[in-house]
């Protein structure tokens, strides 16, 4: 789990131009997929999630505190699933896709007991009691801690509450524009939860809308005017819950608490070893226009198989602790992550268009320590990676991926771009993946990138590399690589006609004809696709 946490801030860089949302939730060893406002509304059938879905054309903030949108986000719809059998006193971790470093503010989490099935309840009719909060502490905002902890936030459920169906309402509040009325930006997320065990407590709470007022001191506030004390909006934290940081005690102590409300005794931090960098600094390291490339051949053990039907697995294990990363050192850090991972690479030769896709599965004995098995980075082959977009049809579990580095030629595209007559052995556009889901390893063959362009890199001119390292159900997985000017010139991205022999134009980043041919052939050949 440490490695997953360490690199989680890279997990959905496709959305970094916008705000964040909860992409995943973990309780113990169980992982659950969040609602994706960019995709789920268009999927048929609609994906079944544990997080309430919302849609406003993206994932913008809620500013009007008088509407139902403040409860579970804009036009929220009930989640179809529950996080089942969660013991009172358990920890729940929310994983956000990304969060802009300039969006400073507090983080609050509430619970509300439903009347029967939460899916049948109007969330604005429920009573919410706060179980976690953090605002400004020692000059650092809670959202800054979220980013430093790889866009994850952990809360502890109260141990004395009664069993039943609950909504857990987790929200971030951005205050960069809160010096004006209705400038505060709320990002609430609601999740269905079945709590077991516990005691008999049924805490009284507040309702949404109603709990927040536009002129509350923690909502209408100028955070850039030398602020040292900040009053977190809403009620104090309920007594038996503990926070992921010290602030739960310190913040609630600043408020006038009603008699009988007990503050937590222990608030030990559950922060994991992390990479401290902002998502915005990462965004600046890759081109705003996606560039799609093949893997560069490396000197690693990923050698081509000897025969068409050969499948060879190579495993290498090393542990190198990654302490920090910066945008100027992403490539070297990537090599460290590669060494840290357990690498499983499966090579597949597809010289003949009639070659059958490989599909095999092996399931080792179950283990009582899924902690080790769930560390699942994307496997990288030393110097460069390709931009690929696939969808996982697995059950929301974290998976790892190995990519066949022999798929496309790695020499300069202007000098060696294949034509219809001299395409390389892998002309059918197949990729091979070894997918690891906890204790299960499966080999898949899939087609070329689902996008409209592939650019071949020369290994000498590849620059910064950014990878996404976690796959979840029905969520696109993207690996980014940024080309230099030399690469763009060599592949027809604004280059002369001579640089793009397969299209005859070479202007505006046209797609090479051999790439289009790869993709068309692959559609007919691959039986199992992400």
From Swiss-Prot:
One biological process term in Gene Ontology: cellulose catabolic process
Annotated EC: 1.14.99.56
Cofactor binding comment, as recorded: Binds 1 copper ion per subunit.
Biotechnology: Lignocellulose is the most abundant polymeric composite on Earth and is a recalcitrant but promising renewable substrate for industrial biotechnology applications. Together with cellobiose dehydrogenases (CDHs) an enzymatic system capable of oxidative cellulose cleavage is formed, which increases the efficiency of cellulases and put LPMOs at focus of biofuel research.
Glycosylation sites: 150
Signal sequence annotation: 1-18
Required cofactor(s): Cu(2+)
Record keyword Disulfide bond present: yes
Location relative to the cell: Secreted
Comp. bias intervals (Basic and acidic residues): 312-324
Similarity annotation: Belongs to the polysaccharide monooxygenase AA9 family.
Role: Lytic polysaccharide monooxygenase (LPMO) that depolymerizes polysaccharides via the oxidation of scissile alpha- or beta-(1-4)-glycosidic bonds, yielding C1 or C4 oxidation products. Catalysis by LPMOs requires the reduction of the active-site copper from Cu(II) to Cu(I) by a reducing agent and H(2)O(2) or O(2) as a cosubstrate. Amorphous cellulose is not a suitable substrate for LPMO9C, which may act at the surface of cellulose microfibrils without any release of soluble products.
Name recorded for this polypeptide: AA9 family lytic polysaccharide monooxygenase C
Species name: Geotrichum candidum (Oospora lactis)
């Amino acid at each position: 789990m440490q490695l997953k946490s360490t690199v989680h801030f890279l997990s959905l860089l496709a959305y970094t131009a916008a705000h964040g949302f909860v992409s995943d939730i973990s309780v113990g060893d169980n992982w659950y997929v969040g609602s994706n406002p960019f995709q789920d509304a268009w999927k048929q059938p609609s994906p079944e999630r544990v997080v309430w879905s919302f849609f406003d054309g993206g994932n913008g903030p809620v500013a009007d505190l008088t509407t139902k949108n403040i409860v579970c986000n804009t036009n929220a719809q009930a989640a179809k699933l529950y996080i089942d059998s969660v013991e009172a006193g358990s920890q729940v971790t929310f994983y956000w896709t990304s969060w802009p470093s300039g969006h400073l503010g507090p983080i609050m989490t509430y619970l509300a007991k439903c009347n029967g099935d939460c899916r049948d309840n109007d969330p604005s009719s429920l009573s919410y009691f706060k179980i976690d909060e953090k605002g400004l502490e020692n000059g650092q905002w809670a959202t800054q801690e979220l980013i430093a902890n790889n866009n994850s936030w952990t809360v502890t459920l109260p141990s004395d509450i009664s069993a039943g169906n609950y909504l857990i309402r987790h929200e971030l509040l951005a205050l960069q524009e809160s010096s004006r009325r209705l400038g505060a930006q709320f990002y609430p997320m609601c999740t269905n939860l079945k709590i077991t065990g516990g005691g008999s407590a049924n805490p009284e709470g507040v309702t949404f809308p109603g709990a927040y007022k536009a002129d509350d001191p923690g909502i209408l506030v100028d955070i850039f005017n030398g602020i040292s004390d900040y009053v977190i909006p809403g009620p104090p934290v309920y007594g038996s819950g503990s926070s992921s940081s010290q602030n739960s005690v310190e913040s609630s102590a600043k408020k006038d608490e009603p008699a009988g409300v007990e503050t937590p005794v222990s608030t030990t931090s559950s922060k994991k070893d992390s990479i401290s960098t902002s998502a915005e600094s990462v965004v600046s390291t890759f081109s705003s226009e996606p560039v799609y490339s093949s893997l560069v051949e490396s000197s690693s053990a990923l050698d081509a198989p000897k025969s068409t039907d050969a499948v060879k697995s190579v495993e290498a294990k090393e542990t190198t602790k990654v302490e920090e990363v910066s945008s100027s050192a992403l490539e070297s850090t990537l090599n460290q992550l590669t060494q840290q991972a357990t690498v499983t690479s499966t090579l597949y030769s597809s010289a003949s268009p009639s070659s059958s896709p490989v599909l095999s599965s092996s399931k080792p004995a179950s283990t009582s320590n899924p902690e080790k098995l769930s560390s699942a980075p994307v496997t990288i082959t030393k110097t460069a990676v390709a931009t690929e977009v696939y969808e996982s049809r697995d059950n929301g579990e974290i998976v790892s991926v190995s990519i066949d580095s022999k798929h496309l030629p790695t020499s300069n595209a202007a000098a060696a771009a294949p034509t219809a007559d001299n395409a390389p052995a892998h002309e059918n556009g197949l990729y091979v993946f070894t997918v690891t889901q906890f204790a299960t390893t499966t080999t898949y063959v899939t087609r070329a990138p689902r996008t409209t362009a592939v650019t071949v890199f020369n290994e000498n001119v590849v620059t910064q590399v950014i990878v996404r390292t976690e796959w979840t159900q029905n969520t696109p997985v993207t690996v980014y690589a940024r080309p230099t000017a030399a690469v763009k010139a060599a592949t027809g991205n604004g280059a002369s006609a001579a640089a793009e022999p397969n299209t005859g134009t070479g202007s505006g980043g046209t797609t090479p004809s051999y790439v289009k041919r790869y993709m068309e052939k692959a559609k007919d050949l691959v039986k199992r696709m992400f």
